[in-house]
A protein has these predicted regions:
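Short helix-loop-beta connector
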Residues: 1-3
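N-terminal Rossmann-like FAD-binding beta1-loop-alpha1 element of flavoenzymes
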Residues: 5-31
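Conserved N-terminal/central alpha/beta ligand/cofactor-binding core
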Residues: 34-150
Length: 150
């Protein structure tokens, strides 16, 4: 019988990061997935980039771009939370902790792209397989953590 403090269902970016954070807080975590192999999630197949922060960017500018892209049909508090908390989490989890190999410029800076609805370049990519790059690093970290059973 499998015993753990927490059961996480799914090992995409949401489930995987939740499992990793819970394990790092000292809990024993079991992760289950419907996929044939760990890492085969919707995250894995995502090709586009992920919102980060551009040069001279601000949470207010990002929030305005999200509202504009959503034709104003957005939950205001969710937009504010995403705009203020999203980029720092990309930095601390995906870049610093997991070391996701996002594309870089020749001088080593993150290569930021500009996608539809954004007024400035603030999107990080890992070639055209951003989701796979994120998922590969996330699964690697989960497998290496002594408190996670995958």
């Amino acid at each position: 019988m499998l015993r753990s403090d927490v059961l996480v269902i799914g090992c995409g970016i949401a489930g995987g990061t939740a499992a990793l954070e819970l394990a790092e807080s000292g809990l024993d975590v079991a992760v289950i997935t419907r996929a044939n192999r760990a890492g085969e999630s919707n995250t894995y197949w995502a090709q586009g980039g992920i919102i980060f922060r551009g040069e001279n960017d601000s949470p207010e500018s990002l929030a305005q771009d999200i509202v504009n892209a959503g034709a104003g049909l957005c939950h205001e508090q969710a937009v504010r939370t995403l705009a203020s908390e999203g980029p720092p989490l990309v930095q601390s989890i995906l870049i610093d902790k997991l070391g996701v190999p996002f594309d870089r410029t020749p001088d080593g800076k993150l290569a930021l792209g500009r996608e539809g609805g954004h007024s400035i370049a603030r999107i990080v990519h890992a070639t055209d397989a951003t989701g796979r790059a994120i998922e590969d690093k996330l699964i690697e970290a989960l497998r290496a953590h002594p408190r996670v059973r995958l």
